[in-house]
Regions:
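N-terminal loops that bind phosphate or other acidic moieties
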Residues: 2-134, 138-379
Length: 379
């Protein structure tokens, strides 16, 4: 084998994508030090998106302070691509659920204001292209906080400016866009979104996601009704009906907020990232691709990282094998087109032991060395 591509998703809570990839590469090199291997860090639209794109574009991190979900100043960061033209933002880095103590989680109060501040900072630096991952949010404010940070004003029926949080949605009667940050009118947003939920309703933002952000049943109902009302005001203001747009309900309606007021596209995270790092070009001429993730199951064949890689590989007729900490629904995975799915576990072990980073690395290295020996023995 002349060229092997290694693109393994993070084993969440255990190994980063790069760590897993390097462990696999070590297994190959232990058998054939001269084999041409290429480790490509990879991610979906959530955890790891920023790090992967910074690495792929030879970009840099920008550190700053912005308002967290409860409007407390928080140190955070975003990324600039190597050419300085594209900003890469993980919404969770400033508006994420882990930033709110469990006892204070309340999507009536939490806001996306800080995400807007990151967008504004990058825009002031000349960025006119944005890649935004909107997973892991603590919010259900339809992106109104983000918009407020960018110069929008939301007014009640008496003309008073409203505050922040999901609680304001039900009171919005008019939207003043006159103070919008001027550069945003010529800015393009590519949004990594891995859910297709509509803006409101039984499958919408509030009913599906608000409870995990701290909402009780009464809050869920109020938030959903607020989003219904807000959708009408948005339609009146912009002419856009975002109600049933797939992904409009993502991140507490953040998807809808971006679609309503900006030149924004919502894309599955894996698809967006593979395109951004020019994955299709990187794999040309490869003899094998090794991918993987912490748990391979039926969701793997429904758009997760290994499946996205498989689709690209099939265009070039490159075989793909999957490494995973655990495996479920093996027949479905084989049917999807993977040439093999292998567990890195050496035998019966506790989850705690399996999640030890050094142990996981050793298991990946051991498995890949054995697989490489078998594959190459057939010429």
């Amino acid at each position: 084998m002349k060229k092997i591509i290694i693109a393994i998703d993070s084993f969440k809570g255990c190994l980063t994508s790069a760590e897993a990839g390097k462990a696999a590469e070590k297994g190959i090199k232990s058998i054939n030090p001269s084999c041409h291997t290429s480790v490509i860090p990879i991610a979906d639209g959530g955890e790891g998106l920023l790090d992967v794109l910074i690495t792929a574009t030879k970009g840099k991190y920008i550190t700053l302070s912005a308002h967290g979900p409860l409007m407390k100043m928080t140190k955070t960061h975003y990324g600039l691509s190597g050419n300085g033209r594209t900003a890469i933002i993980e919404m969770a880095a400033i508006s994420g659920l882990p930033l709110v103590p469990i006892e204070q989680r309340n999507p009536m109060l939490t806001t996306t204001f800080g995400t807007g501040e990151l967008i504004k900072d990058a825009s002031n630096k000349g960025c006119r292209n944005f890649i935004i991952g909107i997973g892991g949010s603590a919010t259900n404010d339809a992106g109104l906080g983000m918009l407020q940070a960018l110069g929008f004003r939301f007014l009640d029926k008496s003309g008073h400016t409203l505050g922040t949080g999901g609680q304001i949605m039900e009171a919005v009667a008019n939207i003043d866009t006159s103070g919008i940050h001027p550069a945003l009118r010529e800015t393009h947003f590519m949004v990594a979104c891995d859910v297709a939920n509509p803006f409101y309703g039984p499958d919408g933002a509030a009913y599906i996601f608000a409870q995990q952000k701290g909402a009780d049943s009464n809050m869920v109902q109020r938030l959903d009704e607020g989003m219904q009302s807000l959708a009408e005001v948005i339609k009146k203001t912009t002419g856009k009906d975002i109600t049933n747009y797939p992904g409009a309900g993502a991140a507490g309606g953040m998807g809808g907020g971006l679609l309503a007021f900006f030149n924004a596209e919502l894309k599955p995270g894996t698809e967006l990232l593979l395109k951004a790092i020019d994955f299709s070009e990187k794999i040309k001429g490869a003899d094998l691709i090794i991918t993987g993730e912490g748990k391979a199951d039926r969701q793997t064949a429904m758009g997760k990282v290994p499946y996205g890689i498989l689709k690209e590989a099939q265009k070039e007729h490159i075989p793909v094998i999957v490494l995973a900490g655990s495996i479920e629904n093996l027949p479905e995975l084989n049917k999807a087109g993977f040439k093999g799915i292998f567990s890195i576990a050496p035998g019966p072990i506790t989850l705690e032991k399996a999640m030890e980073p050094e142990f996981a690395k050793e298991n990946i290295t051991r498995l890949v060395s054995q697989l490489y020996s078998v594959i190459t023995s057939f010429g």
